[in-house]
């Protein structure tokens, strides 16, 4: 499921720095 990974990696709020 690339959608899940893309959603997590595409979430600037998850890292905050990115």
Swiss-Prot record:
Cellular-component GO terms for this entry: extracellular region; synapse
Keyword Secreted among record annotations: yes
Modified residues (Valine amide): 18
GO molecular function, one term: hormone activity
Major site of localization recorded for this protein: secreted
Superkingdom of origin: Eukaryota
Localization (cell): Secreted
Alphabetically ordered keywords of this record: Amidation, Hormone, Neuropeptide, Neurotransmitter, Secreted
Tissue: Eyestalk sinus gland.
GO biological process: chemical synaptic transmission; neuropeptide signaling pathway
Keyword Magnesium: no
Protein family: Belongs to the arthropod PDH family.
Function: Causes the migration of the distal retinal pigment into the proximal end of the pigment chromatophore cells and thus decreases the amount of light entering the retinulas. May also function as a neurotransmitter and/or neuromodulator.
Protein name (database record): Pigment-dispersing hormone B
Taxonomic source organism: Faxonius limosus
């Amino acid at each position: 499921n690339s959608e899940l990974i893309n959603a997590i990696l595409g979430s600037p709020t998850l890292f905050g720095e990115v």
